[in-house]
Curated annotation (Swiss-Prot):
It comes from the Bacteria. The keyword DNA-binding does not apply. Negative regulator of class I heat shock genes (grpE-dnaK-dnaJ and groELS operons). Prevents heat-shock induction of these operons. GO terms for biological process: negative regulation of DNA-templated transcription. The lineage of its organism: Bacteria, Bacillati, Chloroflexota, Chloroflexia, Chloroflexales. Keywords: Repressor, Stress response, Transcription, Transcription regulation. NCBIfam families: hrcA. Belongs to the HrcA family. Pfam families: HrcA. The keyword Transcription regulation applies. This is Heat-inducible transcription repressor HrcA. GO terms for molecular function: DNA binding. InterPro entries: GAF-like_dom_sf, HrcA, HrcA_C, WH-like_DNA-bd_sf, WH_DNA-bd_sf, WHTH_transcript_rep_HrcA_IDD.
Length: 372
């Protein structure tokens, strides 16, 4: 029988994880007793490690006398044993300064976030560009550019603007265009794509059927929203592939089989980061959460992700723009460091977007970043 998970066994599990993360080598009981000066014998520690193995928190590689953590062991560590840490003040200042250099340049924030995450967490990083949580229509304006052509300016909440030309009948006055655009703006006010499609099918406003031209304008808006939603599927940016590939997991130990396994893992890693396959299902979960998400090894639904841990956090301004950022690496990961890095960068990006939109962010379990 494995017995209870006593305080001492929890301490030993924590030390095994700490040692394995540092060395990438299976941990022996003698190592823990000697290095950490434990007040018990190596035989006692060995018995506790055997109990932890029976509980599913450690495993015993066939080629070694030591033990390594399982996914369940890492999960218990993250939820129960890990001490919450923060980046040092010097690191925070350095990171804030880098973002200050591109302040107001939204398109560069994501790339910079990826670079900083990879360098600080010593693993690969991933991020999505900020986008509207759910596209909502705001207004429509029609501008005559020719007697048979008008420019439709479609505005969505979050500052997103789409422009498109459309043919008009000769003789339509600017007042006709203004009136039709105003009616459509009132009809579709704050509508999501699904709601706009419903209103287009009903084709009435205040009980009065829409004219053919007004129906054309509604259909134009619906098509623009549909195209935007399709194009706005999260593109996943990444950085730090060399940081990740420097980990021992990607280096062959000896022999042809080891080399082939290392090459296959390298190929799979590059495919994950290039295509986003395996990561894409995690994005909606992270967007729906207000905190840091940690997915460890076998917890992934995708088989290709079973050797990796992913730490993600949402950033952005609710009701305006939101995105996701995080790190990916082997399950043998420095979880406290990685989590604190993801949490800090997400908070900093949230503050930057809040400043851009002149709103106050609501409290969350993501630690606040100091002002730039």
């Amino acid at each position: 029988m494995s017995g209870p998970l006593t305080e001492r066994r929890q301490m030993i599990l924590k030390l095994v994880i700490q040692e394995f993360v540092d060395t990438a080598t299976p941990v022996a009981s003698e190592t823990l007793v000697r290095k950490y000066r434990l007040p018990v014998s190596s035989a006692t520690v060995r018995n506790d490690m055997a109990a932890l193995e029976e509980l599913g928190f450690l495993t015993h590689p066939h080629t070694s006398g030591g033990r390594i953590p399982t996914d369940a062991g890492y999960r218990f560590f993250v939820e129960n044993l890990m001490e919450r840490t923060t980046l040092s003040p010097a690191e925070q200042r350095m990171i804030r300064h880098q973002f200050y250099q591109v302040r107001g340049e939204l398109d560069q924030w994501v790339q910079l976030a990826c670079a900083v995450l990879a360098r600080t967490a010593h693993n690969a990083s991933v991020a999505t560009a900020p986008r509207a949580e759910q596209l909502r229509f705001k207004s429509l304006e029609l501008i005559a550019i020719h007697e048979t052509m008008a420019l439709a300016v479609i505005v969505f909440h979050g500052g997103i603007v789409k422009q498109q030309t459309l043919p008009i009948e000769p003789g339509r006055t600017p007042e006709d265009l203004r009136r039709a655009a105003g009616l459509v703006s009132d009809l579709l006010a704050d509508a999501t794509l699904s709601r706009a499609e419903e209103l287009a099918a009903i084709a009435t406003f205040n009980g009065v059927p829409l004219s053919e031209f007004e129906r054309t304008l509604v259909d134009l808006v619906v098509r623009a929203m549909s195209v935007f939603e399709e194009q706005a599927q999260e593109q996943i940016y990444s950085d730090g592939i060399l940081e990740m590939l420097s980990q021992p997991e990607f280096l062959p130990a000896s022999g042809r089989d080891d080399a082939e396994r290392a090459i296959e893992r390298l190929r799979r890693t590059l495919e994950i980061l290039k295509s986003g396959r395996g990561l894409s299902p995690l994005i909606p979960q992270a967007l729906a959460s207000g905190g840091v998400q940690v997915i460890i090894g076998g917890e992934h639904s995708e088989d290709t992700m079973r050797d990796y841990s992913v730490i993600l956090a949402r950033y952005g301004v609710e009701g305006a723009l939101v995105g996701v950022l995080g790190v990916i690496g082997p399950t043998r990961m420095a979880y406290p460091r990685s989590i604190s890095t993801v949490r800090y960068i997400a908070s900093l990006m949230t503050n930057l977007l809040a400043d851009l939109y002149h709103v106050n962010t609501r409290p969350s379990d993501i630690e606040p970043a100091a002002e730039l």
